[in-house]
C-alpha cells in the first residue's frame, strides 16, 4: 500500500500497466484520460472491468492507470492483471475468487520471433519439387 492507494503491476504481451486503486466512486483514468476515451472497443472496456464486476467492487474504487507498450488488447489485458493484483493487495480474501476466474495468472503467451530463411515465424518458403 502506498499512502491510501493500493498498487498492482499487470503485464500482457509487451504491455505493462501500473495500477493504483483507492476508495471512491468508480472513476477509471488510463494515462490521464477517462477509460471510455482511452479504450475505443467495448471488448477492451469489458476486459478491464471483469475483476471489478466479479468481486462486486465496480463502483467502490477510483482507479488510476499508467500503461505502456503493446496494442489495445495487450494493454487492456495488462490493466486487468494490474487491477486484479491491486484488489488482492487491498483484500487478500478476494484472491481465491479471482484466481478461480483466471485473472491472477499472467498470460505468458508472447509473439514468436521470425526465423532466418522463413517468411514469418513458421511459414517456410514455398518448396518446388522441380
UniProtKB/Swiss-Prot annotation:
Family matches, as PANTHER family: RIBOSOMAL PROTEIN S9 (PTHR21569), SMALL RIBOSOMAL SUBUNIT PROTEIN US9M (PTHR21569:SF1)
Transmembrane annotation, as ranges: none
Biological process, per Gene Ontology: translation
Native species: Cupriavidus taiwanensis (strain DSM 17343 / BCRC 17206 / CCUG 44338 / CIP 107171 / LMG 19424 / R1) (Ralstonia taiwanensis (strain LMG 19424))
Source taxonomy: Bacteria, Pseudomonadati, Pseudomonadota, Betaproteobacteria, Burkholderiales
Name this polypeptide is given: Small ribosomal subunit protein uS9
Gene: rpsI
One cellular component term from this protein's GO annotations in UniProt: cytosolic small ribosomal subunit
Family, per entry: Belongs to the universal ribosomal protein uS9 family.
Organism domain of life: Bacteria
GO molecular function: RNA binding; structural constituent of ribosome
Keyword tags: Ribonucleoprotein, Ribosomal protein
